[in-house]
Amino acid sequence: MNPMDIHTLTKRDEIRRCLQIARDLPGWFNEAGLRAMERDLGEERTFVAIEGGDVLGFVTVKPLNERALEILWMAVRRELRGKGIGTEMLLFAEEWAKERGFEVLVVKTSGDLSYEPYDATRRFYELRGFVRIALIDPYPGWGEPALVYVKCLKRK
């Protein structure tokens, strides 16, 4: 088995494969989200996890300012969830951010606490040091509640 590699998305084919991963997760990504994701994959920094030529997952980030970096999108192929790929991508993004002077990582996720698919998403971020700082209901442009999480990045 080939070791997993994480690198910056550069190939058009990788964008297509990232979008397919998201399409295969309809409980997390709706059509409006997929359209926004397609735009962001082409315009923002995206890291892809690759093994043996296969895209396993991706994370897209965008600077909010000189100190804060936001995770816009993150997904791992459905059949590979829970195997540490998301954690590795997150650690990669954190190191990338620290090397560029970012001090805070921000992520927004569904704030609808009755919607079960996002329970695992919220738990994922919380177990990796993210702290809920706000519930915005409704979140502008989403039409639904959003939870905002932050994580302070420690420099070595």
Annotated model-derived regions:
Residues 8-72, 77, 90-91, 96, ...:
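Acetyl-CoA-dependent GNAT
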Residues 44, 144-148:
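Short hydrophobic/aromatic beta-strand or adjacent loop that forms the aromatic wall/cage
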Residues 74-81, 111-113:
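A short, internal acetyl-CoA/4′-phosphopantetheine-binding micro-motif in the GNAT/acyltransferase core
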Residues 84:
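Conserved G/P- and acidic residue-centered "switch" motifs that form tight phosphate/ATP-binding loops
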Residues 87:
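Residues forming the Rossmann-fold NAD(P)(H) cofactor-binding site
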Residues 97-117:
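Conserved GNAT acetyl-CoA-binding A-motif
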Residues 116-121, 135-145:
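Short glycine/proline-centered loop/turn elements that form peptide/ligand docking sites
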Residues 125, 130:
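Conserved active-site tyrosine of GNAT-family acetyltransferases
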